[in-house]
């Protein structure tokens, strides 16, 4: 039958270089992606290389809390 909690959860990935540059006001915004992860296979925070339209390059996007 059904388990207690859903295994797949929605996570938000945020550009780490835009967050650092936001202190200097160099970037126009912060790039964010919404994706899913399996809670059992990936219990730690997710980090992926994604394209950032504000930095104009591929950067590390890390998981943030909702």
Curated annotation (Swiss-Prot):
GO terms for molecular function: structural constituent of ribosome. Belongs to the bacterial ribosomal protein bL33 family. The gene is rpl33. HAMAP family: Ribosomal_bL33. It is found in: Plastid, Chloroplast. Keywords: Chloroplast, Plastid, Ribonucleoprotein, Ribosomal protein. This is Large ribosomal subunit protein bL33c. InterPro entries: Ribosomal_bL33, Ribosomal_bL33_CS, Ribosomal_bL33_sf, Ribosomal_zn-bd. Pfam families: Ribosomal_L33. PROSITE patterns: RIBOSOMAL_L33. GO terms for biological process: translation. GO terms for cellular component: chloroplast; ribonucleoprotein complex; ribosome. Gene3D superfamilies: Ribosomal protein L33. It comes from Drimys granadensis. Its main location: plastid.
């Amino acid at each position: 039958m059904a388990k207690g909690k859903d295994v797949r959860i929605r996570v938000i990935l945020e550009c780490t270089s835009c967050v650092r540059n936001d202190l200097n006001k160099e970037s126009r915004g912060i790039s964010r992606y919404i994706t899913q992860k399996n809670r059992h296979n990936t219990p730690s925070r997710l980090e992926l290389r994604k394209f950032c339209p504000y930095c104009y390059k591929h950067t590390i996007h890390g998981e943030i809390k909702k």
